[in-house]
Every structure is written in C-alpha cells, then in structure tokens.
A protein has these predicted regions:
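Short glycine-rich phosphate-binding loop at a beta-alpha junction
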Residues: 93, 386, 549
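Hard-cation-handling environments
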Residues: 202-332, 336-503, 507-519, 527
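Broad gene-expression machinery/nucleic-acid interaction feature
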Residues: 132, 147-149, 294, 466-468, ...
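His/Asp/Glu-rich metal-coordinating catalytic cores
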Residues: 2-71, 76-289, 308-322, 341-344
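Conserved hydrophobic residues forming the short capping helix/wall of the S-adenosyl-L-methionine
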Residues: 108, 402, 538
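Conserved beta-strand scaffold positions in the cores of enzyme catalytic domains, especially
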Residues: 11-13, 119-121, 192-194, 329, ...
C-alpha cells in the first residue's frame, strides 16, 4: 500500500480502556473507518436491574457513510456481545475467522438479524481491503480458538492490534501463534503496536493450556467414585475439549448445562473445533440413568452469576441437578475482577452441601504475561506503543514495559475512551480531540432507556425504600377532602410502626394547612412541600431517607 506522508491515521477507542470489557476501536483515514471488535461489559453492582452494558457508538452513527465494516479478533462476549445492538443502527459487513463467525451467527439468530447482516469468514494469513485499509489476520493463541491479531495497513503506516493473546507453543487445537509473521511485518516498519495489557503486571510467561489437561487427569484419577461437575467459561472450547478427553479416558459420560455452554459447544462441534467421541455426550435429562462415578457435568456459572446453572444448583433451585454430598466440583476459571464475592458465595453454598470444591490449579490464563509482551514488542519494533485491553493499572504496566524496551516516553500513549490519536510516520503523534463515548444500559428489551436518573432512583429505592402518600383535594380550594393514606414499601414494616405512620399523616395534614394559609393551589408546589416536610420528619425520626411519592386526586 502506497504511503501518504501528509494524511493522518486516527485511532479512536470507543470503549475497552480503563475497564475490563466493552472493547471497540475505530480506525479512520480520510473517508474510511473500520471498527475492530464490538463487545459488551457486565453491569457494576450498583447498576440495579441492568442486564448488559454496550458502548455508545454515536461517533460511528455520525460518520456512518465512512464505516466499511466490523473486523473481529475473536469470539468472546467482550468483543462480539454488542454487535446485535449496534448492527440495528450501523448495518455493515462483519469479517472474522470461522469459529468467531459461528458464534456471532448464534447471536444474530437470537436477535433476528441473520438474514440482514453480511458475514465473511477470513482465514489466518488472509487479507481484506476495506476502503483505504488492508487488514491481515494473524494467527494467535487465546482461551478461545480462532483468535487473531490484526495487521492494519493504512496510507499512514502499519498498526498491529494483537487482540487478546498469549504465546502457547503447545496449543490444544491448531497451530501456535505465528511469531514469524509478526517478525516479518516488524521488518517492514510498524507505526504502532496496540497490545493486550490484561496480564501486564504478571512476570514470566503464561502457562500452556495443555497443563490444565494434566490437572484434569489427576483430579479424575483421584475422584473415581464421585460425580464430577466442572464450571468454566462457555467460550473456552479448548478447556471443554480437555474435559471431554479426560472424561473419555476415565469412562465417563459428559452432559452439558447452561444455555450459552450448549450453544457454544454445539457450534464448535459442528464447525470441527471440538472432537467428541461417539456416545460420550448425553443429554442433561439422561444423567439420572448413569451412576455418579460415570458422569461429568460441564456447566456455566464459574463467575458466580446469579442465574447461571451452577449458582442455581448451589441455591437448590435447579430443576434437573441437585448437589449431593461428596460431589466433586471444579472451578476451572479465575474470578473476573469484581466477581470475587459472588464466586465465594457459590463456593460456600456448595461446601455447605458437602461437595468437595476445587478452585486452584484448574485454570490458566488466556492472556500474555510480561515476557510474552516483551517478545511481541521485540519482533514488531513499533515506533509507538498504545496499550489496550485493561484497567488503567494494566495499561500503565505495559507502558513501563515499552519504556524498558527503549520506546521513548513521548511515543507511548495511554488513551482513554473517546481520545482521538492522530499519527503518521512524519509528524509526532498526538491526541487531537475527544469524541463522545459512554455506556448504554440494556434492561430487558430496553436499550438506552435507563439512564443515570433511573439508576439513581433504583439505588434510592434499594437503600431506603418508598413511601406513597395518597390524598384527595377539593379542585378549586385545595382543601383536604380525604386521606392522607400512606403506603410504605422497603422502608418500615407498617404493622410494627403504626405510631410513626400516624405522626407522618399529621405532618402531611400540617403541610396541606400551610399551603392553604399561603393560598398555594399549584399541585406541583403542594407535592414538593409535602415531600420536604415529610422527608425532614422521617429523617429526624429514623435517619432514613425513603423516596416520597405524593399522589393527589381531585374531587
């Protein structure tokens, strides 16, 4: 691709920085934009009732004529989960590897978007041309198969985006990471490297996925007489393959529970990414037909999600599986930051039921540690370092690695979502401006209709409850005709607080009298006076601040 010394490449992260999840980055050159990944994140503890969080793509909507397509690095939720929501407004083609497209197809089917969305399967080593860009897919290793790094060729220079990766010389399925190709591109001259920062604080190398297979073999050998239940990420197909291998080796049938687990395993097996021996896989309803020591159950719930299968088993509300004393339960994952309490709660519930819970040594990370990050930098030799994928401390740790490897401080950019980094070979790179970004909250079928005000109301209700005041006023004079009747929910138990309720009614009546004395007849003002008077009274009596909702009827 011919270089243009005057034009500038604009790199615009719209999510995924200073947080875990919601990865999405736009690359813009003149009249062309490509979007790398389009992921979701899961709600914080204080986002009551929220199911998912997706990125605000206002910038893409404002420049929709420039957007040429979504280029996806791999099939994890934090990289593909927002696609069904964003595609409704920005319907452009999707380019990804075979398994990634298969997992995206599952999502598009759920949202009735399969027929209207163009998908193209790209092989590792292949390139695609989108507007001013050429994008090459490079084989990497991760905790899901078919993961890719991207070499993005633009008139301003080459940018390498690693996606999520690790260096695994002995992967369970397929080839090792294509380090040779990284080196070859590095010799051409790389303008910038955008590298996975998740494990940038961890020294050494990430262990191979195959080591987990040996751990499973040891656990299966030591627990020959018990039922084994294993919780892991649904998308970790290599992990599932090793569980199946150990189950087959020790003569156990395998059942799968959890909607996402069933979907991913079905897709991976159909596309040839899972090798399941004949008659090994059974339906969850069939496990009762086999002795406990002949069954392995692979389930969702490794992160303590309240509605996941393992959590429902722990709470005795699963319809098909009841935890038994001496069950062996393996957590084949590490808690994502923020999920530690939920995971601990599930482990405690399972332990109370007599299960033997194993949550150590049955997991390896899918992300590169410091020595692997250094290796990629050494092969690529970028002019600029742009750490991505992680909280601020992770990005900062990678920035230090880049400094240690000789990249000047002024050539290292720790970006925030919305920053517009402009760069080319000739002029110093700089953050030029900031575009609108943010989080769009998904609650049931509602996308974006729950904002900060609604969340604040939900938090208020959760903390102090609500008090509803119902009264009837004479239309013209605003004289009290009936009530006030007070209904309380989540504040106090009315039957045990009758004196408080009686006093509250008197406070409301006094507030109405004040309005009459001052000739206040505007109902909005009357409601505010009731709220202020009653709120002050309740705070003095209880040191609580319930939401107060006056309802006025006229007669």
């Amino acid at each position: 691709m011919k270089k243009n010394n005057n034009g500038k490449l604009r790199i615009i992260p719209l999510g995924g920085l200073e947080q875990i999840g919601m990865n999405i980055t736009a690359f813009e050159y003149e009249d062309s934009i490509i979007v790398v990944d389009c992921g979701l994140s899961f709600p914080e503890d204080d986002m009551l009732g929220i199911d998912l969080v997706i990125p605000d793509v206002t910038y893409l909507k404002e420049n929709i004529d420039k957007v040429k397509g979504f280029v996806i690095t791999h099939g994890h939720e934090d990289h593909i989960g927002a696609l069904p929501y964003v595609l409704r407004e920005i319907n452009v083609p999707i380019y990804a590897t075979k398994l990634t497209v298969g997992l995206i197809d599952n999502k598009l089917k759920e949202h009735n978007l399969l027929r209207t969305t163009k998908r193209k399967v790209i092989k590792h080593g292949q390139s695609i041309n989108l507007g001013c860009f050429r994008i090459e897919f490079i084989k990497t290793n991760h905790s899901i198969q078919d993961a890719s790094a991207l070499a993005i060729y633009s008139p301003a220079g080459i940018v390498i985006h690693t996606g999520d990766f690790k260096v695994d010389y002995t992967p369970v399925f397929g080839d090792a990471i294509d380090l040779q190709r990284f080196a070859e591109i590095g010799k051409k001259g790389v303008l910038a490297l955008m590298c996975d920062s998740t494990n940038a604080e961890r020294k050494g190398f990430t262990m191979s996925e195959r080591t987990v297979g040996k751990t499973f073999d040891n656990i299966f050998a030591e627990h020959k007489n018990t039922r084994i239940i294993i919780a892991t990420f649904a998308s970790n197909v290599d992990r599932v393959q090793q569980i199946i291998n150990s189950a087959y080796k020790y003569g156990r049938k395998v059942a799968v529970e959890g909607r996402s687990m069933v979907n991913v395993i079905g897709t991976a097996a159909e596309l040839g990414y899972l090798q399941i021996p004949d008659k090994t896989l059974i339906d969850i309803d069939q496990i009762k037909n086999y002795p406990d020591d002949k069954v392995v159950l692979i389930t969702t719930g490794s992160q303590g999600e309240s509605m996941a299968a393992l959590s429902r088993m722990a709470a005795n509300i699963h319809k098909k599986v009841t935890i038994k004393p001496n069950d062996t339960i393996i957590f084949s994952s590490n808690p994502i930051p923020g999920n530690e309490k939920a995971v601990s709660r599930v482990i405690n519930e399972l332990s109370r039921k007599g299960a033997d819970v194993i949550f150590q040594d049955a997991h390896v990370s899918g992300h590169a540690c410091q020595e692997e990050i250094k290796l990629i930098y050494s092969l690529v030799k970028p002019k600029y370092s742009i750490p991505v994928h992680g909280e601020y401390r992770h990005l900062k740790a990678q920035a230090q690695i880049a400094r240690d490897l000789g990249i000047p401080k002024e050539n290292i950019f720790i970006l925030s979502s919305g920053d517009v980094l402009e760069l080319n070979e000739e002029e110093p790179a700089k953050v030029k401006e900031k575009v609108r970004t943010g989080a769009i909250l998904v609650d049931g079928l509602g996308v974006g209709d729950v904002g900060n005000i609604v969340l604040r109301d939900r938090q208020h209700l959760a903390e102090d409850g609500i008090m509803i005041v119902v009264l009837t006023l004479e239309k013209h004079s605003s004289r009290l005709l009936a009530g006030p009747d007070i209904v309380s929910r989540g504040f106090v138990y009315v039957r045990e607080s009758e004196d408080l309720m009686d006093e509250a009614r008197i406070v409301v009546e006094d507030a109405i009298d004040v309005c009459l004395d001052k000739h206040i007849t505007d109902w909005g003002k009357i409601k505010n006076i009731i709220k202020d008077s009653l709120g002050d009274f309740l705070w003095k009596r209880t040191k609580r601040n319930p939401m107060i909702l006056p309802i006025i009827m006229e007669a």
